[in-house]
């Protein structure tokens, strides 16, 4: 390994350097290309290290950059900060922007002045500040009594995001649009459900208030009937009575040759 750092280089980017070795009997190696590099020994050279998250719900976000030299930080565009010193000398500098309003930022810059020599502007990545949580409203409730164990529910969200479920209900539908959204609950056992709710978390991690799903009952089991009093036989009564027991209320359906004006089981 041969290290040569004796010959000073001017500031700039070097992308055409090569090295070759000639041995004692004048055999010369192929050229070894040196990877491109930049010198910032007089004029600071800046590089982005950690971008501002995009989007973010933090209105005082951090930004990290590297400077080849220490100096005074200068800000441009719509961003500013109380952090005014860049450490340089192979260390990263993290700045915290002053409070930003909600919105889209694409013109922020930083530069460093070292010994009166300013760097070029380093453009901060574009980012959006979003501190407003989604707002949800019920559109179509679950039927209060339903024999569908995978019922639908429709709600409105004013922002897109991830749907999060709570209580005894869940669903494979996990993405909400900024519109009406119809979800299908995963299979539910026969029971009454009164603790189900949904929330939506937007792309900036703002989470809505819980939207409570209306109380509903899943009932997929048909009524069970038992004979109580048979029609007497033989009988001379052509409007004979018949008694039965049902474990559920409902509408009576007649079949065969018999009919009645009684239409409801109690």
Please annotate each region the language model reported.
Residues 1-11, 16-20, 31-32, 72-123, ...:
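Extracellular beta-sheet repeat scaffolds used for adhesion and glycan interaction
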Residues 45-58, 137-148, 224-237:
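Short, solvent-exposed loop/edge segments of extracellular or virion-exposed proteins
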Residues 65-73, 155-162, 245-252:
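Short proline/glycine-enriched turn/loop motifs at strand-loop junctions of beta-rich domains
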Residues 59-63, 149-153, 238-242:
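Structural beta-strand segments of beta-rich domains
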Residues 26, 30-44, 124-134, 213-226:
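Flexible, low-complexity linkers/stalks enriched in Thr/Pro that connect modular domains
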Residues 8-9, 55-56, 67, 100, ...:
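Hydrophobic beta-strand core residues of beta-sandwich domains
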């Amino acid at each position: 390994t041969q290290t040569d750092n004796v010959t000073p280089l001017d500031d700039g980017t070097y992308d055409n350097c090569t090295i070759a070795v000639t041995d004692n009997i004048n055999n010369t190696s192929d050229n070894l290309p040196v990877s491109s590099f930049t010198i910032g020994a007089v004029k600071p050279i800046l590089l982005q290290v950690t971008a501002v998250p995009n989007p973010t719900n933090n209105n005082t976000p951090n930004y990290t950059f590297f400077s080849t030299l220490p100096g005074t930080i200068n800000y441009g565009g719509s961003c500013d900060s109380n952090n005014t010193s860049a450490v340089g000398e192979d260390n990263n500098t993290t700045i915290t922007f002053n409070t930003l309003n909600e919105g889209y930022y694409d013109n922020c810059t930083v530069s460093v002045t070292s010994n009166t020599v300013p760097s070029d502007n380093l453009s901060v990545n574009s980012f959006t500040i979003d501190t407003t949580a989604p707002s949800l409203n019920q559109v179509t409730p679950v039927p209060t009594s339903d024999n569908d164990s995978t019922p639908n529910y429709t709600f409105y969200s004013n922002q897109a995001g991830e749907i999060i479920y709570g209580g005894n209900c869940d669903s494979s539908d996990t993405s909400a649009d900024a519109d009406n959204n119809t979800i299908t609950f995963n299979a539910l056992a026969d029971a009454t459900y009164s603790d189900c709710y949904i929330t939506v978390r937007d792309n900036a991690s703002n989470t809505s208030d819980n939207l409570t799903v209306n109380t509903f009952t899943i009932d997929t089991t048909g009524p069970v009937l038992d004979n109580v009093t048979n029609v007497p036989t033989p009988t001379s009564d052509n409007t004979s009575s018949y008694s039965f027991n049902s474990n559920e209320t409902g509408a009576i359906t007649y079949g065969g040759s018999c009919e009645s004006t009684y239409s409801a089981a109690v």
